[in-house]
Amino acid sequence: MDLPRGLVVAWALSLWPGFTDTFNMDTRKPRVIPGSRTAFFGYTVQQHDISGNKWLVVGAPLETNGYQKTGDVYKCPVIHGNCTKLNLGRVTLSNVSERKDNMRLGLSLATNPKDNSFLACSPLWSHECGSSYYTTGMCSRVNSNFRFSKTVAPALQRCQTYMDIVIVLDGSNSIYPWVEVQHFLINILKKFYIGPGQIQVGVVQYGEDVVHEFHLNDYRSVKDVVEAASHIEQRGGTETRTAFGIEFARSEAFQKGGRKGAKKVMIVITDGESHDSPDLEKVIQQSERDNVTRYAVAVLGYYNRRGINPETFLNEIKYIASDPDDKHFFNVTDEAALKDIVDALGDRIFSLEGTNKNETSFGLEMSQTGFSSHVVEDGVLLGAVGAYDWNGAVLKETSAGKVIPLRESYLKEFPEELKNHGAYLGYTVTSVVSSRQGRVYVAGAPRFNHTGKVILFTMHNNRSLTIHQAMRGQQIGSYFGSEITSVDIDGDGVTDVLLVGAPMYFNEGRERGKVYVYELRQNLFVYNGTLKDSHSYQNARFGSSIASVRDLNQDSYNDVVVGAPLEDNHAGAIYIFHGFRGSILKTPKQRITASELATGLQYFGCSIHGQLDLNEDGLIDLAVGALGNAVILWSRPVVQINASLHFEPSKINIFHRDCKRSGRDATCLAAFLCFTPIFLAPHFQTTTVGIRYNATMDERRYTPRAHLDEGGDRFTNRAVLLSSGQELCERINFHVLDTADYVKPVTFSVEYSLEDPDHGPMLDDGWPTTLRVSVPFWNGCNEDEHCVPDLVLDARSDLPTAMEYCQRVLRKPAQDCSAYTLSFDTTVFIIESTRQRVAVEATLENRGENAYSTVLNISQSANLQFASLIQKEDSDGSIECVNEERRLQKQVCNVSYPFFRAKAKVAFRLDFEFSKSIFLHHLEIELAAGSDSNERDSTKEDNVAPLRFHLKYEADVLFTRSSSLSHYEVKPNSSLERYDGIGPPFSCIFRIQNLGLFPIHGMMMKITIPIATRSGNRLLKLRDFLTDEANTSCNIWGNSTEYRPTPVEEDLRRAPQLNHSNSDVVSINCNIRLVPNQEINFHLLGNLWLRSLKALKYKSMKIMVNAALQRQFHSPFIFREEDPSRQIVFEISKQEDWQVPIWIIVGSTLGGLLLLALLVLALWKLGFFRSARRRREPGLDPTPKVLE
């Protein structure tokens, strides 16, 4: 059946690394098989199948057999019962002097699934060669019935002491004393390394006849041979038939007990010339033909005792000895002196080589073959870490023989200059299969150049190698390559992934370990990351064991298990990684710790194997080794639960109330919840599984819109029993009452799980266990339920244009305003200094069908803050903003939720405040309307109302000035000494203060100071210019001009006012930036130039210091006052010292007298002097009274 899209998505997400962390290995009921901890029972484990009977093969490399710690292998039943030791430690290799103590049998195990046999190796098995013990290693092959079948020891070489030595003693009467000969014989025998695979000795004695004292194979130890030699008595005889004795030894002694391939050595001891000397030539020739090396010892006691010249005797003995004589011929003065040549004779014999010299004679003696093992089609690969001076090698044992690559075969990747590093090649061996190259062998060398290396190669019968690829480790001491595993993910017979362990990788202060992943691409393995551990910062040795196991989770892909035996304070843990589509998911699906399984487990995970179904339930089980224990983990069947949900009817029609619930009209519906279990393993196709589900209505709402008819208001919990492959459906009745929100669908959520998760099947860790399906409301539009609205949005602001500002604020006539706006763009709007807000009048109208979930999106530029939205009273709907935080640059408002009716209209006003922290040259407000309904593209253009303005701000500045000097009178007696030789000082201040809301910039203060007349007479000296703002930059021009020190005569009576138009000036330009409420003071400090002011001709004059504010061309600010400027006036007056000429005085006097005379005459003519007499009356007494 088709799966809902949600299930597929959830399943795909679960396959993503880290999405889940559960798995189907049962940790509640493991089988823990105990063994000896001192023997390290559990160091290696292998699952074994014998005719359908399942066993566990467990290695115990420190197991004892008798008095020797040989190691051994156990077979253990998987269900119940005790383990049985196979006593492989008692297996003896014939014809060698072996040493089995500490040979570590069971250190490596390899099973052969073709014939159900397995190989158990003892890499430290050694054998005696002379005075040395060679640790060549040995493996034992065990058949399907747990019976030893053969030994495998490809590195075993014949010793240098592999010799058959026959001692030919002259026992004639002339030998005296015999006891000295016996002492010599015993001493030389003690020098020999007698034993299997080494020297064996036979003794013949001759005189007139020849007899066997003992044959070559009679005794197998020095002790026995010495004991036998001590009982040899002198046979006697009157003749010395040396040729006969040599021929007897050649033809009979070497045949009876002689070994094929052994070096034949003959030691002839005689004290006189032979009586059959004519036969010597033939006898010696036959000995040469049989490759018998002859040592001849001449005892001169008989000749010395009788004073006979021994020259002829010595020549005969030298003829008997092999060439050269100096190495094979000895002579002693008498029988007692034989003891003196024992050491020399022994050294010369042992200088012989037991086999022909070849390249491997001295390269494999310490090879430790079997340190690792791997079964291939035609035999077995064995790692030999000690071969070639511990650089290591890989040997191959087949039914046709053995293949031992030459040392030179490895030089390409293991150069001669690094031979002393001890690479340990063969520490682990495995193989991969590619479609082009077939089977390729893989071997690890964890100590190569201290970082480790892995090589991929093929081996040829001519003892050469072809190395196809090499991989090198990253970190010194990480032991990269100590564990290697190839993985065929999809089971097609071709390797997909090669995993390389570096268990000692040091990270964050701990030996955490690392496992590298290499994927096969075009016949090369390419690095593709690493597997992840638990991120627990501890010494874990993650990657100490890596096992490719068959499909554990029943998804048809093989999996990987990695051991970390030192995790959790050496308790140990394993990690299970799933295979998926040709690769390995790098996050573990399950981490199993030793503490979950049993108490006291240590080094859990040191070995892992998982290829068989051990309990006959159709599932692959795991075998894991630990210190003194072997643990079997059982797999649980995996089930996938397919869930689906549908509704009848398919939509909620709130306009059709078809039932009553709680006395109210309601819309009734039914949900059908269906489950189908799918067991992944074929063995479980008739199994049942119990699940429990929880169903919830409108789970994310505080008050649900739908209600269940039975059980809880919005929850139901039920248990059901499902049969494999069969669908079971549950009916859940529910109803919907009146609700304000019938736009968003009602969500039905289902969660389900196993009824008994601790037993039986387990839910697939990559399969969803939740289901969410929604049932929509019917929208009430036309028959196709497709609503087509037509939203129209209109908006305008209250900002004035430049023309409107000129007419309304500046109150200028239209003609003057036209000239005023010429300097502005037509899109410029003016922000008055008193304005703090911007208002937008807007309307939203729906000219089409119902618009569901209509929203109004309001956005503004950063220099505005949303203040409020006020709806007009005559609106047909409502509008509510859901986020009115002032700092947000966007607001979302719901319009008549849940739907905006057809032909409805809503009017509203928006207010925005200017930001006090952000200043921009422009202003943007955008209103956009939209809905969940599908409006036609042709009508969407008017859904947006953008308002964009280029701004000019009215600067609100206070511009003032002050001065310490406004008037000065120049007097004739004014002294320069009072003013330091210059003149009276002055201090002027121009002050600008920003009273507005916005920071002001793009303005310039321009100050002009008349400093001299056009004739070069200095008027004043500007001593200093200061501002109280460090970031205000000013430029000063004209203050450095040098004027004449002595003023010249100049009449200024016609120029009562001196300014920049008729004087030389100092100009100061300053760029101004003012934040709100900031002020800047410009200080002018100087002195009047009194020397010139006294010399110039004037009565009174004014020196005008002018300061003007100017806006720069691109400044966003304007001034309400045209060209604002301020002046400071220095009014200078002067007193004159006049001298009147004499003629003026005389003329003035005479003129005054003449004027007086004319005045008197005129008065006389007018009767001025007669008027008093004419006014007297006739009757009056003219005579005055007399005082008596």
Curated annotation (Swiss-Prot):
Notes on the domains: The integrin I-domain (insert) is a VWFA domain. Integrins with I-domains do not undergo protease cleavage.
Carbohydrate-modified residues: 82, 95, 291, 331, 358, 449, 462, 528, 642, 694, 857, 894, 973, 1031, 1039, 1059
Domain VWFA: 164-345
Segments in the Extracellular topological domain: 23-1141
Record protein name field: Integrin alpha-11
Coiled-coil spans in chain: none
Binding site for Ca(2+) 1: 488, 490, 492, 496
PANTHER family: INTEGRIN ALPHA, INTEGRIN ALPHA-11
Lineage: Eukaryota, Metazoa, Chordata, Craniata, Vertebrata
Signal peptide (from-to): 1-22
Outcome recorded upon mutating residue 1170 to A: No effect on RAB21-binding
Molecular function GO labels: collagen binding; collagen binding involved in cell-matrix adhesion; collagen receptor activity; integrin binding; metal ion binding
Recorded topology in the membrane: Single-pass type I membrane protein
Binding site for Ca(2+) 3: 613, 615, 617, 621
Assembly with partners or alone: Heterodimer of an alpha and a beta subunit. Alpha-11 associates with beta-1. Interacts with RAB21.
Cytoplasmic membrane side: 1165-1188
Annotated Gene3D superfamilies: Bicelle-embedded integrin alpha(iib) transmembrane segment, Integrin alpha, N-terminal, Integrin domains. Chain A, domain 2, ntegrin, alpha v. Chain A, domain 3, ntegrin, alpha v. Chain A, domain 4, von Willebrand factor, type A domain
Classification via Pfam families: FG-GAP, Integrin_A_Ig_1, Integrin_A_Ig_2, VWA
GO biological process: cell adhesion; cell adhesion mediated by integrin; cell-cell adhesion; cell-matrix adhesion; collagen-activated signaling pathway; integrin-mediated signaling pathway; muscle organ development; osteoblast differentiation
Main location: membrane
Record keywords, A-Z: Calcium, Cell adhesion, Disulfide bond, Glycoprotein, Integrin, Magnesium, Membrane, Metal-binding, Receptor, Repeat, Signal, Transmembrane, Transmembrane helix
Subcellular location: Membrane
Tissue: According to PubMed:10464311, highest levels of expression in uterus and heart, intermediate levels in skeletal muscle and intermediate to low levels in pancreas, kidney and placenta. According to PubMed:10486209, also found in brain, colon, lung, small intestine, stomach, testis, salivary glands, thyroid glands and prostate. Very low levels in peripheral blood lymphocytes, fetal brain and fetal liver.
Superkingdom of origin: Eukaryota
Similarity comment: Belongs to the integrin alpha chain family.
CDD domains assigned: vWA_integrins_alpha_subunit (cd01469)
